[in-house]
Amino acid sequence: MKNKQSNTTEKGMAYDRMLCTGLNDAAKQIHEDAKRKGFWDSERETGTLLMLCVSELSEAVEADRKGRYADLKAYNECEKADDIFESDKEVYELSSFQSLIKDTFEDELADTVIRILDLCCARGTDLEKHINLKLKYNRSRERMHGKAY
């Protein structure tokens, strides 16, 4: 059944409000960090940046194929550890990240989003606005958007 465009979803919730907020602020911070690390010392082509996003998604696929998933429970326990000398804490946290989070499915998805947000800030794209517009439009479309998959 095709939804008629209105200000409510099938469940009656209003969707004319911003559903996606904070991404533009995150994009600014990510882009500033990337500039500080030298990733923007020279202008970068949009196509290259988009392919870097694709490569991160490919790494997420590979992590999934290998069954590599983040163990946040163990990582959070490591963060709570109070028997670590303050001078060793940074090394301990880095080691915990590398063994429990790095190169996992979730880590690669995070890398993908970071690259997308960096690109959006660099190109002046208001991603929050575009996501909200797309969500609103998609709610007006038929089931599965009229496609098999």
Region spans (language model):
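Flexible "arm" and connector segments at domain edges
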Residues: 1-149
